From Swiss-Prot:
It is a multi-pass membrane protein. Keywords: ATP-binding, Cell membrane, Membrane, Nucleotide-binding, Plasmid, Transmembrane, Transmembrane helix, Transport. Belongs to the ABC transporter superfamily. The lineage of its organism: Bacteria, Pseudomonadati, Pseudomonadota, Alphaproteobacteria, Hyphomicrobiales. ATP binds at G379, P380, S381, G382, A383, G384, K385, S386. Residues 346-580 form the ABC transporter domain. One of its GO terms (molecular function) is ATP binding. It comes from Sinorhizobium fredii (strain NBRC 101917 / NGR234). Residues 29-312 form the ABC transmembrane type-1 domain. This is Uncharacterized ABC transporter ATP-binding protein y4gM. The chain crosses the membrane at residues 30-50, 66-86, 162-184, 256-276. CDD domains: ABC_6TM_MsbA_like (cd18552). It is found in: Cell membrane. Its main location: membrane. InterPro entries: AAA+_ATPase, ABC1_TM_dom, ABC1_TM_sf, ABC_transporter-like_ATP-bd, ABC_transporter-like_CS, P-loop_NTPase, Type_1_exporter.
Length: 586
């Protein structure tokens, strides 16, 4: 019967939603539904007893019966009030549990995704789907429970009172039904289309706020305030217009229902007068019927509007499932084992690799990163340096071939054990909102304060930290906005120090720093890389002179490799890059 209230395209969506969520909250919904049945029965009883109220006071004028009826009315409304309270409490409990469950499930799914996923879903869209769309799940289920079960029970009970007492009047009242159904169906289709556009506009607002916040220096430097203001004004205006359109469409059901109900009530009053005056019906029966009819109006109106509200909320549910059903590209084998301890030799063997656009980057790539040695990756942009790092960290899998650590294929080991063996410092330093101590401690869970301080000292970060207002408890702001570039970089190095990993990866760790900061960070890196397998991506060749081995990438292939002295003695790619960067121009 519920399927009659929604479009065919949404029926399977609703059934899936109920199957996945309703059963987990069955005890709470069971109590709530039981309370709704009590409310429906008491509502019907309040209409039924109006017959005795009128007949005992107007017809029989029996004072004892009047007092008895008064006590019964008080009991009816007390029971109804208590049942309504219980219903509200357990509906809220179940609804809040559903939101929490949905958000945890979506966030876990997002965490398991590979990097390509984030090019499809920008952060603003993820925020909408984790908040608004999770709320939509609760809204749909509560609509089903309250508007369908509660209102349907109440309507059925009141209709029973009406039919038992006055079948003919009940038939007159039902004559308005087809008109109401047709009007609501037209409104529903319009609401669904506008709701999809409104949700997209909300995502644009969130994205604009994020971009303005994270790029505030660029906004100020290029005097983009007016541009950002105009863009935000457009997005807000779009949401406002669409919200107003939805409000108008939803409100349009009220005049439809009010007008049709007015005709029904007018017809009932006219016909009931004839029945009382000419056929001897008691005034109590008439009053009871009209009371039931008036009480039935509200649940009938809510049921009529339910389709509009349900279709609107299901737009958010559909978007939530689009995210929840997005396939996970990188998965861990059931037979995956923890990566055993070892020296940390990394080997690429006959690796073919391409990104989603289909253009092949590596073709039969073979390269080895010796254990305990520092290897520099150099070459022009687009040569594949960062892609090698992505494969080592298993952010992607090769199409063909294998990447191994100490002879273990990365596909055969667990994600956690692999990444626990790797310390990473990137060019684009990222700090989480929180304190300096918190950001360093992310390098290793459970690290003591002494270990955190020692890591900071090794990274040449301790001195500047102690000059901060609250030392290690100083808040860094969103993405470390309160710190300089060099300070942020040294904190990320301290984080890698604390990890104490056998494999270290540095992706242009000093490229954007001033000379003093670069010297301090180079000193920190020299201490950190001792006796560890280290891979350094560098565009500035001055940073790789001390590397044990230099791998020169060009066009997705290893063009040449060896220590710097040997590469400079050859007339190759490295020598050409070296002369361009480090030798004075003629």
């Amino acid at each position: 019967m519920l399927q009659k209230f929604i479009s065919k395209s949404n029926q399977s969506l609703l059934m899936r939603l109920l199957a996945e969520n309703f059963k987990h909250q069955a005890p709470w919904y069971g109590i709530a539904i039981g309370s709704m049945v009590v409310v429906a029965v008491m509502t019907s009883a309040s209409a039924w007893i109006m017959r005795d109220v009128v007949n005992s006071t107007v017809v029989s004028k029996d004072i004892e019966k009047v007092f008895g009826v008064a006590v019964t009315v008080a009991i009816i409304f007390a029971v109804k009030g208590l049942a309504t309270y219980v219903q509200s409490i357990f509906l809220s409990k179940a609804g809040n549990n559903i939101i929490a469950h949905t958000q945890r499930r979506l966030f876990e799914h997002v965490l398991r995704q590979g990097l390509s996923f984030y090019s499809i879903y920008p952060s603003s869209e993820l925020l909408v789907r984790l908040t608004n769309n999770a709320q939509a799940v609760r809204s749909v289920i509560e609509l089903v429970v309250t508007s369908f079960i509660r209102d349907l029970f109440s309507l059925m009970g009141l209709l029973a009172v009406m039919v038992i007492q006055q079948p003919l009047l009940s038939l007159v009242s039902a004559a308005v039904g087809p008109g109401a159904i047709l009007g609501v169906r037209v409104l529903t289709r319009k609401v669904r289309k506008i709701m999809e556009l409104e949700i997209a506009s909300i995502g644009q607002i969130i994205q604009s706020v994020q971009e303005t916040s994270t790029g505030i220096r660029i906004v100020k430097a290029f005097a983009l305030e007016d541009f950002m203001r105009r863009r935000m004004d457009k997005y807000i205006g779009d949401v406002e217009r669409r919200a107003n359109s939805i409000a108008r469409l939803e409100a349009a059901s009220s005049p439809i229902m009010e007008t049709l109900s007015g005709f029904a009530i007018a017809g009932v009053i006219a016909l009931s007068g004839v029945l009382v005056l000419q056929q001897g019906n008691t005034p109590g029966e008439l009053m009871s019927f009209i009371t039931a009819l008036l009480l039935a109006y509200e649940p009938a109106k809510r049921l009529a509007r339910m389709r509009i509200s349900l279709e609107s909320a299901l737009v958010g549910v559909r978007m939530m499932y689009q995210l929840a059903d997005h396939p996970i590209e990188l998965t861990e084998k059931n037979s995956a084992i923890p990566l055993p301890e070892g020296p940390g030799e990394i080997r690429f063997k006959d690796v073919n690799f391409s990104y989603k656009n289909g253009e092949r980057l590596f073709q039969n790539l073979n390269v080895t990163f010796p254990a305990g040695k520092t290897t520099a990756l150099v070459g022009p942009s687009g040569a594949g340096k960062s892609s090698i790092i992505n494969l080592i960290m298993r952010l992607y899998d090769p199409d063909v071939g294998s990447v191994t650590v100490d002879g273990h294929d990365l596909k055969d080991v667990t994600f956690r054990s692999l990444r626990d063996r790797i310390g990473f410092v990137g060019q684009d330093t990222f700090l989480f909102s929180g304190t300096i101590k918190y950001n360093i401690s992310l390098g290793r869970e459970g690290a003591s304060d002494e270990e955190i301080i020692e890591a900071a000292k090794t990274a040449n970060a301790h001195d500047f930290i102690m000059k901060m207002p609250h030392g290690y408890d100083t808040e860094v702001g969103e993405n470390g906005i309160k710190l300089s570039g060099g300070q942020k970089q040294r904190i990320t190095i301290a984080r890698a120090m604390l990890r104490n990993a056998e494999i270290l990866i540095f992706d242009e760790a000093t490229s954007a720093l001033d000379s003093e900061s670069e010297i301090q960070i180079r000193q920190a890196l020299a201490r950190l890389t001792r006796k560890r397998t280290t891979i350094m991506i560098a565009h500035r060749l001055s940073t790789v002179t001390a590397a044990d081995n230099i791998v020169v990438m060009e066009g997705g292939q290893v063009a040449e490799q060896g220590p710097q002295g040997r590469l400079l003695s050859q007339d190759g790619v490295y020598r050409r890059l070296y002369e361009l960067q480090l030798l004075p121009s003629a």
